[in-house]
């Protein structure tokens, strides 16, 4: 007499199934350790012998450039999350003050409406964004970038020498900038309430001695 296999309610054969043995499908620890050592050794050799061209006139290899962009964008987004944004960024006085600061400090790299590329802007890598074309950053992210700068981009940390209030003035202007014609830009720059040095002296939370110590509007920073 031949025993028939047990059949479940669904009509399929009920076969004992063993749990998946992950150890059979994953590399062993010695293999992982050896592979890590080899990759680290190759990276060390590449760095030591200077294969990678660090010159500003030699663009990054595409995978490296892609990774750096992701690192930059995520780093800025995470750190800007705690920034408290003022409610008066559309205030005309803020915008005018920011225009004066922008004209003094930023046009050499970021240009302005109707302005030709400068020698500095042409020599930068990565190239500085032309801010009159707009940016995809939030006000909080723009403030963080202006205050802390960005490594290896020639973007300085203006927070070492400028107050939070002045940097928010710059944010207010930068957000207005893409909508300005060259003539409107010149007009608004001329309307700046004071020159750069006077604006800095008048700020109550001006960093002392360039130390960057100020009443920070960033929570937890």
Regions found by a protein language model. Give the residues of each.
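Sequence context surrounding c-type heme c attachment/ligation sites in exported
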Residues: 96-107, 136-144, 187
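Short, flexible loop/turn segments with low-complexity composition
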Residues: 183-193
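Periplasmic/extracellular electron-transfer cofactor-ligation site
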Residues: 99-126, 151-157, 178-183
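Periplasmic c-type cytochrome electron-transfer domains
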Residues: 15-96, 100, 120, 137, ...
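Extracytoplasmic electron-transfer domains, predominantly the class I c-type cytochrome c fold
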Residues: 123-179, 221
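N-terminal amphipathic/basic-hydrophobic helices that include classical n-h-c signal peptides
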Residues: 1-14
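Short terminal (N- or C-terminal) low-complexity/amphipathic segments
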Residues: 185, 217-221
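Short hydrophobic/aromatic-rich motifs at helix boundaries and adjacent loops
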Residues: 78, 113-116, 143
